Amino acid sequence: MATSVLCCLRCCRDGGTGHIPLKEMPAVQLDTQHMGTDVVIVKNGRRICGTGGCLASAPLHQNKSYFEFKIQSTGIWGIGVATQKVNLNQIPLGRDMHSLVMRNDGALYHNNEEKNRLPANSLPQEGDVVGITYDHVELNVYLNGKNMHCPASGIRGTVYPVVYVDDSAILDCQFSEFYHTPPPGFEKILFEQQIF
């Protein structure tokens, strides 16, 4: 009897449930291990400034991913997807086979080739939110929740969200808790363990 009581008390003292706590998945954020040498990341890995590029901390494993960037201050910038082989010190990105980005002028570049372009009257401005969808074939751009019908493709391999800044640009990233509802079928970036 005394053994049962001690066991019960030990269980209550150690948290009471007797269950092993689940490990919480880390949040996707900008990855300070994969950024340019003159990049500054602040706001818990959600804001980029300085000069250069930075990858997000999780690759796009699931079929349809969505993420957003809010333009806090204009300048030179670009957003899209890239492999870990991209040179994050050499901007603008989109000049090689390792990145596919939309630049601040509305042009989408991959392998130094313009793949598409936003209409001239729809260029992102300070305060705008740019959403990106990626389905392992096509990247598409949304401006303040509106599909810009501006697809681009061509990149191969495991890709990560990427952003670069220069000339006083400041961008905030949203990998969850979005400003705008993702398009049907698209969702926040999931870590590989969350998919299976």
Curated annotation (Swiss-Prot):
Superkingdom of the source species: Eukaryota
UniProt-listed Pfam families: SPRY
Q: Which residues form the B30.2/SPRY domain?
A: 2-184
Q: What SUPFAM superfamilies is this protein classified in?
A: Concanavalin A-like lectins/glucanases (SSF49899)
- Modified residue N-acetylalanine is at which positions? 2
UniProt KW keywords: Acetylation
Entry-linked InterPro entries: B30.2/SPRY, B30.2/SPRY_sf, ConA-like_dom_sf, SPRY_dom, SPRYD7
PANTHER family membership? C13ORF1 PROTEIN-RELATED, SPRY DOMAIN-CONTAINING PROTEIN 7
Protein name per the record: SPRY domain-containing protein 7
